[in-house]
Swiss-Prot record:
One family name in Pfam for this protein: Coq4
Membrane disposition: Peripheral membrane protein
Species annotation: Drosophila willistoni (Fruit fly)
The protein's name: Ubiquinone biosynthesis protein COQ4 homolog, mitochondrial
Enzyme class: lyase
Enzyme Commission number(s) of this protein: 4.1.1.130
Other comments on record: This protein may be expected to contain an N-terminal transit peptide but none has been predicted.
Cofactor(s) named in the record: Zn(2+)
CC terms in the record's Gene Ontology section: extrinsic component of mitochondrial inner membrane
């Protein structure tokens, strides 16, 4: 019965998307929905299957193909995203995120203010992570192959929060750190793309890294991934001033991070 209700709900949601596309004035679109319509590419189920298969092969052969990784996430993640939506709607904090649709990039976050926060706060740790790893929140690709705007936003949210998860877990952006974070995200979100990145990313580890991965990182990542509360309903932007070390000790959302040494490289 629950499965039938969920399928009916998804059908109604897709019908609503089509009505918005044809007669947008009847249901005013918010800023994210308007942006999503500019980038959205409608595809058939068969095209979705082909894109999913092709992007998975391309991503395995070359993990630097971020466009293929993004395509893989969108063409294989719809079922997991519906479950994430249910989780978000069951949480007060998640409901606020769905209403506000916050974005994480340099035009929406006051990074100058975050730099002035005490070094033990989440906001300061996030800025330090970006600088230390030479990454920017502006590099995420727009969602193109998800029709429902709610699911498209959740995929966008997942992408934009990825570096925040790195920060919380104290993981660098090298292959070893990425694989560990992907395991945590996979077990927390059930997104097929995350499982793929975790499994096939580990294959590309160097022998020394693989030993560390099997001995320390993999058990740690699986334990954290299973024990953490859902990460998607976390309104990270309202936690910039939170003490990161205290949060890791007291919150089931932020568990103690694995100690990283230079030899892990």
């Amino acid at each position: 019965m629950m499965q039938r209700l969920r399928l009916a709900r998804r059908g109604l949601a897709l019908s609503a998307v089509r009505r918005q596309t044809v007669v947008p004035e009847e249901e005013p679109l918010d800023a994210y929905e308007r942006e999503h319509l500019k980038h959205r590419i409608e595809i058939t189920p068969f095209q979705r299957m082909l894109l999913g298969a092709g992007s998975s092969v391309a991503a395995i052969l070359d993990p630097r193909r971020h466009d293929m990784i993004a395509c893989l996430g969108e063409t294989t993640g719809e079922g997991a995203l519906w479950n994430i939506l249910d989780t978000m709607e069951a949480s007060e904090e998640g409901q606020r995120i769905l209403i506000d649709k916050p974005r994480i990039h340099t035009s929406t976050i006051d990074f100058k203010r975050l730099e002035t926060l005490p070094p033990d706060t989440f906001g300061a740790a996030y800025v330090k992570f970006l600088k230390d790893n030479n990454v920017t929140p502006d590099s995420r690709m727009p969602v193109r192959f998800l029709e429902d705007p709610k699911l498209a936003y959740l995929m966008t949210r997942y992408r934009e929060c990825h570096d925040l998860i790195h920060t919380v877990l104290n993981m660098p952006t090298n292959m070893l750190g990425e694989v560990a974070v992907k395991w945590v995200e996979a077990l927390n979100t059930n997104l097929p793309m995350c499982y793929g990145g975790a499994v096939f990313g580990a294959v590309r580890l160097r022998p020394k890294q693989r030993r560390e991965y099997l001995k320390r990182y993999l058990p740690w990542a699986i334990d954290n991934g299973k024990r953490m509360k859902p990460l998607m309903p976390v309104y990270w932007e309202q936690r910039w001033e939170q003490n990161l070390d205290l949060a890791k000790k007291t919150s089931p959302i932020m568990l103690p991070a694995l100690r990283i040494t230079r030899r892990d490289g």
